[in-house]
A protein has these predicted regions:
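Active-site-proximal region of nucleotide-activated glycan assembly enzymes
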Residues: 30-32, 38, 109-135
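Short, well-ordered alpha-helix to beta-strand connector turns
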Residues: 29, 47, 88, 133-134
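An amphipathic, basic-hydrophobic alpha-helix
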Residues: 61-90, 100, 108
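An aromatic- and histidine-rich active-site surface loop
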Residues: 39-41, 90-109
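Conserved nucleotide-sugar phosphate-binding/catalytic loop shared by glycosyltransferases and other
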Residues: 4-9, 28-71
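Short beta->alpha connector loops at strand-helix junctions that form conserved
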Residues: 52-57, 94, 116-119
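Short amphipathic alpha-helix
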Residues: 14-25, 38
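Residue-level detector of alpha-helix initiation sites
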Residues: 12, 16, 96-98, 120-124
Length: 135
């Protein structure tokens, strides 16, 4: 059985489509979901099992940029470890800055990356991940 990881940003526009996708895939695949603290308020914890990951927003506070860049690189290594530990075959990103470390980690590990953009405009994270995505 394929192991699929759905990574989603913290807004309702990212999380709600992710939960629908989770529901659709859960009967045929082993599916996990990852979001950040902002996204947790949109996820029904009784219905969905998910992991919380803290990824800094690089552009929110410019004076924290050096620290946040360091944390971002740590997140990439944590994402690699997460994908290996969970034997993930496919990563599906619905966008949001917290999804990029997982997309990059999947690319490094030669896993398939699928992008699902629920918004009318392609976001920055999915735009960068487009370079190494499968679809």
């Amino acid at each position: 059985m394929k192991n699929i990881l759905i990574v989603t940003g913290g807004s309702g526009g990212h999380v709600v489509p992710s939960t629908s996708l989770f529901e659709h895939l859960k009967n045929k695949f082993s599916v996990k979901m990852v979001s950040d603290l902002r996204g947790s308020k949109y996820i029904n914890t009784e219905k969905f099992k998910y992991e919380l990951i803290d990824v800094p927003n690089l552009f929110l506070k410019p004076y924290l940029l050096p620290i946040n860049i360091f944390k971002y690189f740590l997140n990439i290594f944590q994402s690699i470890k997460f994908l290996k530990n969970n034997k993930t075959n496919i990563v599906i990103s619905t966008g949001g800055y917290m999804t990029f470390p997982f997309c990059l980690a999947a690319f490094i590990l030669q896993k398939k990356v699928f992008l699902f953009e629920p918004n009318s405009v392609l976001g920055r994270s999915n735009r960068f991940a487009l370079k190494f995505s499968t679809k």
